[in-house]
Amino acid sequence: MAETKVAPNLTGIEQTKAGQSFTEKLSAEAMEFFCNVAKLPFSQQAVHFLNAYWAEVSKEAEFIYSVGWETIKYADMHCKGIQLVFKYDEGNDLDFDIALYFYEQLCKFCEDPKNKNYATTYPISQPQMLTALKRKQELREKVDVNFDGRVSFLEYLLYQYKDFANPADFCTRSMNHDEHPEIKKARLALEEVNKRIRAYEEEKARLTEESKIPGVKGLGATNMLAQIDSGPLKEQLNFALISAEAAVRTASKKYGGAAYSGGAGDAGAGSSAGAIWWMNRDLEEKKKRYGPQKK
């Protein structure tokens, strides 16, 4: 993310919204916290948002995961010229031009007749169609909270759900709440699964290309490709999935929907419900794609 530039004595957000909100100024400490969250990968930004607003936004979590998150990753891949998912390192923000593309793809998805159930099931998640000129104005004047000329997933989420969310309130709800050790362990276990998926997919792609070569080399690659699902890379992936499932299960039993203040007696209670939901949903997706297939 580009270096955040804040004008002297202007740590607030010069935006307008019904009620208190985007006009409320952020303290220097709150702005620093906000910028730090916005530097995290898209998925971790989403978890921070869901933790803060779980009571209000839990019914929209699936849209945020399967549509919002997938679309912003797709836009980031498009920007970076990456076509294969396993080669993608999750980003944290988009410049305004790619943010326009993100919104364009989001609107296109929601307007597609085959996705009409998303409109009825997740009404407050539906993006507003705007011209490119108007959208860029909105991005500059209303979405870009920290004035860095870029759009993070957190900024998109706060603006999309502005009827109940805003930057100042987000910071108030989220600051001084550490990630619980068991939740961190589960998150890192899922990141290990991602590493194993990448190693597996890279080898699979290499063998697929090599199998197209005529002669002995191509035949050898074809044979290795046929055995890849019983090879060491798949075994390592299976082990990582099992370990992640155990870690997520432990975190879910201990802290599903519970509060955690990191031992700070006067810090208040920070919900972990969003993190627990996200990890379970992510694990479900990984198991569906790479876990043992039912016969």
From Swiss-Prot:
Source superkingdom: Eukaryota
GO biological process: actin crosslink formation; actin filament bundle assembly; parallel actin filament bundle assembly
The name this protein goes by in its record: Calcium-regulated actin-bundling protein
Biological role stated in the UniProt entry: May contribute to the structure and reorganization of filopodia and pseudopodia accompanying cell movements.
Keywords associated with the record: Actin-binding, Calcium
Keyword GTP-binding belongs to the record: no
Name of the coding gene: abpB
Keyword Magnesium assigned: no
Subunit details: Monomer.
GO MF term (any one): actin filament binding
One of the record's GO cellular component terms: intranuclear rod
